Amino acid sequence: DTASYSNIRRMLAVQNILPPKDAVRIEEMVNYFEYDYNKPDKNDGKFGVSFEMGDSPWNKKNKILRIGIQGENLSENKKPKSNYVFLIDVSGSMSDSNKLPLLKESFKELVNNLNPDDKVSIVVYASNTGVVLEPTLGKKKKKIISALDKLQAGGSTAGGDGIKRAYELAKENLIKGGNNRVILATDGDFNVGVTSNAELEDLITSYKNQNIYLTILGFGMGNYKDDKIKRLSDKGNGNYFYIDNQKEAHKVFNQGLQGTLYTIAKDVKIQIEFNPASVKEYRLIGYEDRRLNNEDFKDDKKDAGDVGSGHQVTVFYELVPANGGFSDNKVDKLKYQEIKVKNSSDIATFKLRYKEPDGDKSKEMVKVVKSDVYNKENSID
């Protein structure tokens, strides 16, 4: 997810206001950008991993460890057939130029990248829900674009009804082993119809378990319900983007979406064990809603996030070195326990587990983080 960055940029640059605290999600800020990470090799399978450590910019005694994960980039002949349902909000609140008009031009970029055998359906919702384009092959681009051009804004927003119909249509046209996905585009103002968060989340989760995933695109300004959109996309094993101008739309539809729409691994989890001989204290920066208990790492029944083709994940840890460094946590030494540490140049051991998109058992890769990842001159990215 990268919505937080573009949403904050809009608040600062257009509205000239400071964003509220909850709008600043660190992991979405750092994952907005692309980095030069190691690509997967034959031994690593679907993921390449990069490590770099430098001095903390806010406390020179502490260190920042960056973990960069690079997903496999699927070639065109490896990408599965896609079954997309565009679920488009055409309520009155979408009439602004940076909402429905921008949405229509943005979706045309996705349509132009469709493969001939892909399927596209379009469901719209406002006061009523309707199917404006029955399942259509990707080779019929003019027909799909014509349906988009005819969309007009008006009425209130029955978002819950629209989601139900979109999922039903996706299931009716399910491609076994394919990429089945609802792409919801809205300003987030679900104010009429079935709007219970719990009911919507249960609905989305039930279809996720049938391998129908959800991507959400937020358009425009003002009444965009960012927290609700985030929860819904998380429940749908999906991702979401915030689009506020044509430049951002081009970036999302030609870079962000093209990779994340094709899942290469599901239930992706990482776990890192720090060497007490090297690290006295540590903290994960961001990802408050993504953290798992230690025992969940090897539990294949525990749900986690998916990773798409070419997708990158960036994780930062702040570290207090064992040989010194500032700490506000003043605690007494243990009286009855003595921790014996293994002296080595290891900083940590990194583990990553994932399942194949159609698999039930996890694969695991292990990497050792050595002290030579320290770079006194932090890299420019």
Regions found by a protein language model. Name each.
Residues 1-11, 16-23, 37-52, 57-65, ...:
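An acidic, Ser/Thr-enriched
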Residues 27-37:
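Short, structured protein-protein interaction patches enriched in aromatics and acidic/basic residues
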Residues 25, 158, 196, 378-381:
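Secondary-structure junction/capping motif
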